[in-house]
């Protein structure tokens, strides 16, 4: 098994861990509907950048 020659310092350890932090999801608000959605994703209503891309299907609950 490999063993390092000398112990890594607290500074080196911290520098290595500096990229490990988790970020929250980037959310945007659609200008047309005001819906919140993930960046670069379509909103639940089918809008992207203010234009309707898809027409949403009727949900199962609406058919009953």
UniProtKB/Swiss-Prot annotation:
InterPro entries this protein is in? Answer: Ribosomal_bL32, Ribosomal_bL32_bact, Ribosomal_zn-bd
UniProt-listed Pfam families: Ribosomal_L32p
Q: Which UniProt keywords apply?
A: Ribonucleoprotein, Ribosomal protein
- Segment Disordered: which positions? 1-64
Q: What are the annotated disulfide bridges?
A: none
Question: Compositional bias (Basic residues) at which positions?
Answer: 1-16
Q: Name one GO cellular component term.
A: cytosolic large ribosomal subunit
The record's GO molecular-function terms, alphabetically, read: structural constituent of ribosome
Q: Which GO terms describe its biological process?
A: translation
Recorded family membership:
Belongs to the bacterial ribosomal protein bL32 family.
Name of the molecule in the record:
Large ribosomal subunit protein bL32
- Source gene? rpmF
């Amino acid at each position: 098994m490999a063993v390092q020659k000398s112990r890594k310092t607290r500074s080196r350890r911290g520098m290595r861990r500096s990229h490990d932090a988790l970020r929250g999801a980037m959310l945007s608000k659609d200008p047309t509907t005001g819906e919140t959605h993930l960046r670069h994703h379509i909103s639940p209503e089918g809008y992207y950048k203010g234009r309707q891309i898809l027409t949403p299907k009727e949900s199962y609950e609406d058919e009953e």
